[in-house]
């Protein structure tokens, strides 16, 4: 059975997304990119993020949606901003799609590389290898979103 998965890596400057099809252990990347968030007021940035997500859902339908949870940050302002972005994304996904899966950065790293403490570069290398891609994927926000989708695909296979 083919499953179309949307993987999301929320960020304060860019939100990475990946659209992947998973079928019997074979994963095919359909599209990946960024919702770019311009420097502005927080309210405008949240609106921009939600409009970008609306556009993705307008152009695609999904069986599953997975989002990476907030990572630990030393700057409290950054954590608060990310939490607000994540809350807005969560609400938008629930309104458009319904339920979604959440994975911590450690879960994503472990699922993709086998090591919970892997670097972003190690994750990027394994994403490229697992999907059989010839070119590097940049920026790493996109790679992280693909890794979230791969993690969810692997988790679904375990549950089925």
UniProtKB/Swiss-Prot annotation:
Binding site for Mg(2+) 1: 9, 141
HAMAP family for this protein: RuvC
Catalysed reactions, as listed in the record: Endonucleolytic cleavage at a junction such as a reciprocal single-stranded crossover between two homologous DNA duplexes (Holliday junction)
Gene Ontology BP, a term: DNA repair
Native organism: Campylobacter jejuni subsp. jejuni serotype O:23/36 (strain 81-176)
Broad class of where this protein is predominantly found: cytoplasm
Name this protein carries in UniProt: Crossover junction endodeoxyribonuclease RuvC
Known cofactor(s): Mg(2+)
UniProt-annotated location(s): Cytoplasm
Cofactor binding summary note: Binds 2 Mg(2+) ion per subunit.
GO terms for MF: crossover junction DNA endonuclease activity; DNA binding; magnesium ion binding
SUPFAM superfamilies, per the entry: Ribonuclease H-like (SSF53098)
Subunit structure: Homodimer which binds Holliday junction (HJ) DNA. The HJ becomes 2-fold symmetrical on binding to RuvC with unstacked arms; it has a different conformation from HJ DNA in complex with RuvA. In the full resolvosome a probable DNA-RuvA(4)-RuvB(12)-RuvC(2) complex forms which resolves the HJ.
Enzyme class: hydrolase
Active site: 9, 68, 141
């Amino acid at each position: 059975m083919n499953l179309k998965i949307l993987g999301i890596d929320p960020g304060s400057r860019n939100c990475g997304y990946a659209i992947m099809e998973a079928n019997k252990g074979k994963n095919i990347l359909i599209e990946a990119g960024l919702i770019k968030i311009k420097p502005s007021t927080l309210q405008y940035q949240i609106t921009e993020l939600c409009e970008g997500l609306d556009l993705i859902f307008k152009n695609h339908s999904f069986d599953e949606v997975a989002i990476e949870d907030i990572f630990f940050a030393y700057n409290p302002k950054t954590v608060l901003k990310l939490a607000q972005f994540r809350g807005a994304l969560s609400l938008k996904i629930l309104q458009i799609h319904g339920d979604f899966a959440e994975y911590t950065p450690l879960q994503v790293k472990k699922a993709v590389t086998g090591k919970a403490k892997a670097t972003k570069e190690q994750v990027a290398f394994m994403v490229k290898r697992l999907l059989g891609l010839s070119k590097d994927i940049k920026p790493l926000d996109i790679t992280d979103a693909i890794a979230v989708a791969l993690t969810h695909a692997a988790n679904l296979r375990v549950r089925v």
